[in-house]
Swiss-Prot record:
Stated name of the protein: Mini-ribonuclease 3
Gene3D superfamilies, alphabetized: Ribonuclease III domain (1.10.1520.10)
Location in or out of the cell: Cytoplasm
Cofactor(s) essential for the protein: Mg(2+)
Source organism of the structure: Synechococcus sp. (strain PCC 6716)
Record-annotated active site: 32
Recorded family membership: Belongs to the MrnC RNase family.
Record's function text: Involved in correct processing of both the 5' and 3' ends of 23S rRNA precursor. Processes 30S rRNA precursor transcript even if ribonuclease 3 (Rnc) is inactivated; Rnc processes 30S rRNA into smaller rRNA precursors.
EC number from the UniProt entry: 3.1.26.-
Amino acid sequence: MVMMASAPFLPIVSDAIAAQRLSPSALAYFGDAVYELFIRFIFLTPPQRINAYHHQVVAHVRAESQARYMDILWPHCTAAELTIFRQGRNAAADGPKRVPAKIYRQATGFEALLGYLYLTDPQRLQDVLALLEQHIRAEVAAAESL
């Protein structure tokens, strides 16, 4: 299991003021980077070829996966977090044609939430990512056992 406290991408200082000034789309843009780095960090072990890393990461950073993970997080979110999610979801532009608009919007809300937590509450972000990591590792283990 990844030790999130030692993860190199967690902020040293939170910045709630900066987060309040950012648009939901900007939070989502930032959250997308946070999430992809988190996913890459998870799949670094065990060592494997770069192509295998890439396929695993792509499978988990897709809008469909992000929307599914938001469904998992939903019951664990505070009212304020759900507000950030909704703002991100509602700010989403039309996504790629391969993804239904509802899924794309939900993924954008998920990214906005992660971006917001990165800037405002690193401990909460750590808790959220730890919960996601449990689900991701369980999915990977189930897929490998087939």
